[in-house]
Design a protein with these regions (language model features):
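Class I SAM-dependent methyltransferase Rossmann-like catalytic core
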Residues: 10-34
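Class I SAM-dependent methyltransferase SAM/SAH-binding core
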Residues: 48, 58, 63-108
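Helix-to-beta-strand junctions that scaffold the AdoMet/dcAdoMet cofactor pocket
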Residues: 65, 129-131, 145-147
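Conserved beta-strand signature within the Rossmann-like core of class I S-adenosyl-L-methionine
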Residues: 148-155
Length: 211
């Protein structure tokens, strides 16, 4: 029985990794399309992806907006076997290497001045930053967004980690941010909360708006 359970667990983990894989036609490609579809963006200027992993969303952004320069930052820990070299290889394979830059970075303290980017995006990153205040991470990402710039920050926003996100969205509105919304990406991107939960992303929500 234990052997069967371990085999099932291995198959499940393998399936999840395939969904996250670059260019694998998995669920994450659909998630990326949903995230980018909520950006009211003219395609000019610079995009920052916080936590770029394999570079998939960075590259998708470059393909979607041919005039944009896209910067992907990541801590690249050992858990997922991603690296700067892998991101650069993936960007080259899609023909966008000249417009994609990848560099080491920390979501808790981004190495960019205030108001550096026209767009800031992120996808399932913040909940992996151990011991961090999730709302502070969001504010740090928004710090580097230009006035008038747009953002789309997607994560598994469990209340025990994120706290009151409706209250946070209102806080942003009170600070002058416009068109701030929380979108249920478990439903929109995965088709159902059950399917999202199979990937341990049942509380997926996308925070979007304009600074």
């Amino acid at each position: 029985v234990i052997t069967i359970a371990l085999l099932v667990l291995l198959i499940w983990i393998t399936w999840i990794r395939r969904q996250y894989a670059f260019g694998g036609g998995g669920i994450m490609e659909q998630v990326h399309r949903v995230v980018l579809s909520h950006l009211d963006y003219d395609g000019e200027g610079k995009i920052l992806e916080v936590g770029c992993g394999s570079g998939a969303l960075t590259i998708r952004s470059a393909l979607t907006w041919p005039k944009a320069k896209v910067i992907g930052v990541d801590y690249w820990g050992a858990v997922y076997n991603y690296s700067k070299a892998l991101c650069e290889k993936n960007a080259a394979s899609e023909g966008v290497a000249s417009r994609c830059v990848f560099q080491h970075g920390d979501a808790k303290q981004l190495d960019f001045p205030d108001e550096s980017f026209d767009v800031v995006i992120s996808n399932y990153v913040y909940h992996n930053v151990m011991g961090a205040d999730m709302q502070k991470l969001l504010l740090e990402s928004l710090r580097v967004l230009k006035k008038g710039g747009v953002f789309a920050l997607n994560d598994d926003m469990k209340p025990k980690m994120y706290g009151d996100m409706e209250g946070f969205a209102q806080k942003l509105r009170d600070m002058g941010y416009q068109d701030v919304r929380l979108i249920d990406t478990a439903q929109e991107a995965f088709g159902s909360h059950r399917r999202a939960a199979m990937m341990m992303l049942g509380s997926s929500r996308l925070l979007v708006g304009r600074k």
